[in-house]
Amino acid sequence: MNKVFICGSLEPGRDGVGDYSRRLAAALIQRGAQVALLAFNDSYIDGISLTEQVQGEFHIPVLRIGKDESAGKRISEAKKWIDQWDPEWLSLQFVPYAFHKKGLPWRLGKQMRKIGRGRKWHIMFHELWVEAGDARKQIVALLQRAIIKSLVSKLDPLIAHTNLP
């Protein structure tokens, strides 16, 4: 099985979902899978970095794209790298704030569809939306729910999970 996990950032020890993805990738590699990681909106780097990250005894191929890169550049670099890697599965590790500073990644579904056209999708929803509170939070929560529905509609994942009860 050849799989790419896509998350916001992959700075070791600074991004919980990135750390989770790295540990999961290492566990799958240990079982014989080929796995790579893509940080599509990395807050901890400038530019684009093609490297490896180490988890235990495993070296994991990584593409990190800085958050300040244009959407077009992020899409083209990610698509080129994914096409070279040629994974059977793409796994989006979704946290709204990982892909947009205000937690409203409106274009994420369209962007992911462009980089992963014709591939099988899995989505892991680590956080769904902010808890309702004041009027502003209620509006953000409604918008985040709409974004999630759009994301599912655009990617049509074969599998979706959440870690929330």
Listing of model-derived features with the role each one plays in the protein:
Residues 1-14, 90-96:
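Nucleotide-activated donor-dependent transferases that construct or modify glycoconjugates
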Residues 3, 34-36, 121:
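Hydrophobic anchor at the start of a short beta-strand
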Residues 7-8, 12-13, 26-85:
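N-terminal strand-loop element at the rim of the active site
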Residues 13-27, 104-108, 143:
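Conserved alpha-helical elements of sugar-nucleotide-dependent glycosyltransferases
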Residues 64, 79-105, 119-124, 157-162:
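Short N-terminal targeting/anchoring amphipathic segment
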Residues 110-117, 139-160:
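Membrane-proximal helix-turn-helix segments that form the acceptor-binding/catalytic region
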Residues 119-146:
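Acceptor-binding helix/loop patch of EC 2.4 sugar-transfer enzymes
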